[in-house]
Amino acid sequence: MKINIILLFVGLILAFAVLSNAISIKNDGGVNPFDNNNSGSGSGSGSGGGSSSSGSGTGQSSGTVSSSGSASNNTSSGSQSGNASSGSSSGSSSGSSSGSSSGSSSGSQSGNASSGSSSSGSSGSQSGNASSGTSSGSSSSSGSSQSGNASSGPSSGTTSSSGSSQSESSQSGNASSGPSSGTTSSSGSSQSESSQSESSQSGSASSGPSSGTTSSSGSSQSDSSSFTTTGSQGSSGSSGSSQSDSSSFTTTGSGSGSSQDSMSGSDSMSGSDSMSGSDSMSGSSFTGGNSGGSTSTGSGSYSGNPSLTGSSEYSSSSSGGGSGSHGGSSSHPNGWTDVGQFLLGLAEGLVSTVASNTKLCFQSVGSSITDFENAFQLIDSGFSRLSKPLIEQGLMDLGSGLLEVAIAFETCNVQNLASEIKALATNIESGELGILEVIVKETINIFHNGNQLTTEFKLTISDYKSQNYLGMGYNIGGIVGILLKD
């Protein structure tokens, strides 16, 4: 019973002390902590610990200030809040900061509380007791960001904060400005350098003592071309064209009859000319027997690298003694022309063996490989520049070149391959889709029905650059063989 009386007495004393303190504060112009009708505004900010926080409050408020976290008068970890006689600021603030706040204030200090330590050296409270928004004391905060709103009322004292706030904004988007350097590939364009072949057209015809006429007509694409007839009776005519470095035809002796020498289209020599013996050509040879009713003594020789358009047939009926030979020399192995080597290589790339008479015809057929040279110059540039249009233009030139090959094969009686190559060449030249497909990714590849032909094309380019016409033709023959299979 005595204990209860003592406790009641102590409680009355404490209540009286609190009431006296409140009255004293009111008389001093302060704020009654139990008066909820006071109005005021307050705002504050705090930062630190590498994170940013912001908060603001204005206007009238009543009640208590609340925020995320709690704080006592001395030390808080979270946001500082407390009892407000003037009310709580409308708004909210949250966040955390590392640092310290020290000093004494009877004003409002609402905002973000530090997660460090807070010390107070006054008997007042540091938790937002403000009527007019006045604040005295000092508050310091350190951290890595500064944010918040200042108080709406005057403040006596200092508030300092140290820290830094950094924000990095990334700009995303597409920027295209200024010139760009590098490789620019053109689409829809083609570049080609065409090689022009130089040829001289010259020809001469001379006749020695002869009771007859000798005529020579046609064109000769060569350095020199001469036809000489001596000591013969009758008439001889020569028409056609020859592509060679040098050629000469000589007949000596006596004979009678007539001969027609046609070297354009289908080449035939028929008549009763006195030539008996064997005719041979370097690389391949052919022989013919001569019999007839005329006699001739002497020798006939033919030297050089002729290039004839057509097949050659030699028929004669004469009697007598003599010999004729085909031979000569040039800058190519075995006396072969560029075209002859190319056609031979292409045929060997398609079939296992080539007949000797076909080889002879290839050696003398008049054709051109200019389209092939243009084609692989463009294809080479397309590989280097990753340009699909250049390669496609080169493939069209390849088709044009194959049309020339088909004509040469027809001339040399390779009819079965000639018709197939002609049909294929027409499709390639027209750019028909599906024959050859050009795919551009990191590199360029050429396909036909799933079969990659890139390696074959690059080997052909290498042979073209080194002027290996036999190898160039062989690789093209391999490509054509694959295309003809399907």
Swiss-Prot record:
Segments crossing the lipid bilayer: none
Alphabetic keyword roster: Glycoprotein, Secreted, Signal
UniProt-annotated glycosylation sites, renumbered to this chain: N37, N73, N74, N83, N112, N129, N149, N174
GO cellular component terms given for this protein: extracellular region
Highest taxon, organism lineage: Eukaryota
Compositionally biased tracts (Gly residues): 41-60
Signal peptide (from-to): 1-22
Coiled-coil ranges (or none): none
Chain intervals with Low complexity compositional bias: 61-318
Region span, Disordered: 30-332
CDD domains: SctA-like
Location relative to the cell: Secreted
Family: Belongs to the Sct family.
Protein name as it appears in the record: Secreted protein C
Organism: Dictyostelium discoideum
